[in-house]
């Protein structure tokens, strides 16, 4: 079938936007026409597959030129423009949290719930999950299918890049001796901040509740999810300490086998040789979700699994890669 993929990328010059371009190139997506869109960066140039494109103004752009758009410019931009794009017959992949919790908006990790794409009958908005959720669920979904997870506790150790360019710049400046604190409530360099996003009335942060809401929407609405989200002085790569309670017993060898059979998972689990994933070693424009430190215990007649998960939160499964995989699914399912 001869199809034209006419793609707009909103937020093309941002941290994630630039990584989306890299993923498009690496996965050799055949795009007929590409339109980077922005606001303050209008007129700047973006390169894709050795061709240069000027960033165009979102406000004045002719929507009839495109049939697919990726929004990577935050909730405010998505709220203002995304539904207008959909009304013009354009599929929208949104990386912000704006529409993730709307009941009829599919929240998609292709390896887990591609059926959400298959059943689409007309152009719509598709939400990309939270970066911490994507890597978590890719790793634990095969365990849930096999062993029935009935409780999840996760502590995230989230990189500065997850907050964007200003946060990275402030982090680098602090490392150089500048004491300005603007992006986070406290200094991040040489520190650990047990707060990602704002606090809610229940004393959890919004980021912590996102993990619960999105896990239940994608994986299973009946699983209790408890999380603590921590910002750490790491430029890139989110890490997670995960504790799972399961209905059924298992062994470490069985967990290894399940994960080795899972697309997108790379198992690194050899404690005798100090071999386990770290963001410094493994979150460098990597597509895989890395899993290690697996332990299986029986505590008070309950079955528990502990593990450590690392992924590139910008290039990888947490953001750019998952968005492009959704685009690939739309193409492969003849939706565009």
What are these regions (language model features)?
Residues 1-188, 224, 289-290, 294-300, ...:
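N-terminal Rossmann-like NAD(P) cofactor-binding subdomain of oxidoreductases
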Residues 69, 160-336:
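Charged docking surfaces used in two-component/phosphorelay signaling
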């Amino acid at each position: 079938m001869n199809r034209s993929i006419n793609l707009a990328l909103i937020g093309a010059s941002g941290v994630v936007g630039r990584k989306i371009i890299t993923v498009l190139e690496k996965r050799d997506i055949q795009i007929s026409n590409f339109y980077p869109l922005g606001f303050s960066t209008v007129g700047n140039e973006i390169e894709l597959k050795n061709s240069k494109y000027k960033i165009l103004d979102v406000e004045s752009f002719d929507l009839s030129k495109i049939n697919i758009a990726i929004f990577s410019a935050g909730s405010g931009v998505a709220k203002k423009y995304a539904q207008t794009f959909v009304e013009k017959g354009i599929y929208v992949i949104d990386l912000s949290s704006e529409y993730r919790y709307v009941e009829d908006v599919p929240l998609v990790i292709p390896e887990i719930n591609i059926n959400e794409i298959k059943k689409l009958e007309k152009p719509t908005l598709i939400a990309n999950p939270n970066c911490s959720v994507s890597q978590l669920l890719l790793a634990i979904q095969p365990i849930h299918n096999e062993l029935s997870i009935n409780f999840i506790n996760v502590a995230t150790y989230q990189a500065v890049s997850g907050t964007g360019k200003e946060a990275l710049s402030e982090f680098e400046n602090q490392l150089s001796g500048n004491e300005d604190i603007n992006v986070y409530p406290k200094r991040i360099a040489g520190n650990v901040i047990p707060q990602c996003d704002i606090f809610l009335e229940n004393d959890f942060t919004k980021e912590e509740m996102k993990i619960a809401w999105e896990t239940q929407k994608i994986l299973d609405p009946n699983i209790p999810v408890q999380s603590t989200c921590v910002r750490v002085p790491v430029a890139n790569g989110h890490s997670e300490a995960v504790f799972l309670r399961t209905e059924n017993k298992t062994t470490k060898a069985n967990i290894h086998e399940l994960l080795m059979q899972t697309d997108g998972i790379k198992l690194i689990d050899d404690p005798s040789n100090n071999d386990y994933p770290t963001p410094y070693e493994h979150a460098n424009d990597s597509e895989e979700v890395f899993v290690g430190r697996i332990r299986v215990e029986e505590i008070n007649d309950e079955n528990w699994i502990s593990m450590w998960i690392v992924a590139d939160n910008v290039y990888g499964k947490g953001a750019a890669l998952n968005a492009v995989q959704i685009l690939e699914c739309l193409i492969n399912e003849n939706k565009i």
